[in-house]
Design a protein with these regions (language model features):
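Glycine-rich, often acidic, oxyanion-interacting loops/wings at catalytic, nucleic-acid
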Residues: 126-216
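Glycine/alanine-rich phosphate-binding loops at beta-alpha junctions
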Residues: 1-74, 83
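Charged, often Cys/His-bearing segments associated with DNA-binding zinc-finger transcription factors
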Residues: 1-3, 14, 149, 336-337, ...
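Short helix-capping/linker segments at secondary-structure and domain boundaries
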Residues: 106-109, 138-139, 197-200, 236-240, ...
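Phosphate-backbone recognition surface of nucleic-acid-processing proteins
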Residues: 36, 84-87, 91, 216-219, ...
Length: 349
């Protein structure tokens, strides 16, 4: 008799519960997250078992071990799974059983499992973004120190350019001693971060940028040599999205719709989206609007039509949504971006 297995994964251990075709559940089994113990437990399960596990922050190695053991893994969307379980009580065993029941009933809300090599390559782009965020944070701290002690100047437009660095070095002695040391440490850290970011970007240019999908995405307005790899790697297999709108929604560019009693209202964007992909398309939209090239004037026209009525934020999101949906068709049809005959600005959202 076939069994359906639910795995409630935590940082240090997982709880497994099996449910058979009649809905009878096994006793919960707790397995510590020691790789050998985990692998040995998986070997004891029936061959090619169906296992459901939530996409928590540490699922990579757990899924790898399950697939290595020959099992069929189903990655569950945590928020949707909890809604469908509909429980008021929560225990590890109940969560594992709930996943197993959803899997058995064919109602498990599944997420796509990116292949291992793709997950690994994503780390290049995601680490670059993290280092850039850290660099911005350090720059803000230095700017704040300069302002606190009245050392700002209008003669230098970029405090971290060549002239800006020279200016900071010449005024460093005017800070209190400990503040001066901390500013210098942060300046040194910025140089190290810049070197690491450049090293990562060079790796991206060599290992990822030459790919045919990346080259196609570079035809999208505002998408350059870094944004194209981000978009490609975060999308993965575009065929997992049935429609272009599904990709835009996954990227957090489609507002939620609430309808009741004949009234429809648009809500905000869900927080549970791919934030990396959202950032990439919004960044591309901002770049496309800033450049205002004749070839992509239709993008600026869409932005300008929405700007007066909805403001910059919503207008940019609308442009980003257009770019996301265009990227879907570019990857599906394997064609370069072409300006649409007509952009409909009255689309909801």
């Amino acid at each position: 008799m076939q069994q359906f297995i639910g795995c409630d994964a935590h940082k240090r251990f997982s709880v497994f519960v099996a449910v058979d075709e009649r809905g009878r559940a096994s006793k919960p089994t707790r397995v510590e997250h020691v790789q050998k113990h985990f692998a040995d437990f998986l070997k004891q399960l029936p061959t090619e078992s169906e296992i459901a596990i939530e996409s928590t922050g540490h699922w990579y190695w757990l899924v790898d071990e399950m697939e290595r053991a020959g099992h069929h893994v189903h990655l569950a969307n945590p928020m949707e799974a909890k809604k469908r379980m509909g429980r008021t009580h929560k225990t590890d065993a109940l969560d594992a059983k709930g996943l197993a029941i959803l899997l058995r009933n064919g109602t498990l809300p599944e997420s796509w499992i990116p292949p291992g090599p793709l997950r690994d390559r994503r780390e290049l782009l995601r680490t670059r973004m993290a280092l850039r965020d850290l660099r911005s944070s350090l720059k803000h701290r230095i700017h704040a120190a300069v302002d606190r002690y009245g050392l700002h100047t209008d003669s230098v437009t970029d405090l971290f350019g060549i002239k800006g660095r020279e200016y900071l070095s010449s005024r460093l002695a005017e800070f209190p001693p400990e503040t001066a040391r901390m500013v210098q440490i942060q300046l040194d850290a910025l140089e190290e971060l810049a070197a690491h970011i450049e090293s990562i970007e060079q790796r991206i240019r060599v290992e990822i940028a030459p790919g045919s999908e990346v080259q196609l995405l570079r035809s999208v307005p505002g998408v350059g040599e870094i944004l194209a790899p981000v978009i490609w790697l975060e999308i993965g297999d575009v065929r997992r999205f049935p429609r272009a709108e599904n990709l835009a929604s996954y990227a957090g560019l489609v507002p939620r719709v609430f309808s009741s009693g004949g009234h429809t209202r648009l809500g905000g964007i869900s927080r549970f989206v791919n934030q990396y992909l959202k950032w990439a398309f919004v960044e591309a939209a901002n770049c496309a609007v800033r450049l205002k090239t004749h070839r992509h004037s239709h993008v600026d026209s869409l932005y300008q039509r929405l700007l007066a009525r909805r403001g910059h934020g919503r207008a940019i999101v609308a442009v980003a949504r257009h770019l996301a949906e265009a990227s879907y068709w570019i990857l599906r049809k394997r064609e370069n971006y072409r300006a649409p005959q007509k952009l409909i600005s009255s689309r909801k959202g």
